[in-house]
């Protein structure tokens, strides 16, 4: 838990920056938010009900390791994925691979194995994946990382999702 002083308070809105929260207090996924109102006339602050908000993970890097398979055979191996926020030891983590193709794209979901501690670096094994170029999403307790979009109007892939991507050979 962390106490953050709001940047702005009105009758209908409270604005605060998550950058003011100590980094070890935030994790990807669903977070509780509660308002504590202290008063000079009371030693005990008045607390609001907790309200959930979703903090999306961001994939900062992805690498393929220990790939097995030849020719057109499905591949097995592991993905080493780094996130911008810690993932809790007890949080459910799923990696989604969406083939980057305009034809019928393959889709794969792989659950990360249990972890002994919070981490920003995850190793997720995969099996049965056809060789190809894939968009990758990290899902932590139901909160999906966002995909990047090609914003170059002169590009053949303008407005297509384009990152993060990984090639499985």
Predicted regions and their residues:
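Short beta-strand segments of immunoglobulin-like
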Residues: 62-72
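Immunoglobulin-like IPT/TIG beta-sandwich domains and homologous Ig-like subdomains
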Residues: 1-43, 72-144
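Short beta-strand elements
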Residues: 41-62, 144-169
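Generic preference for flexible, low-structure residues
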Residues: 69, 111, 150-154
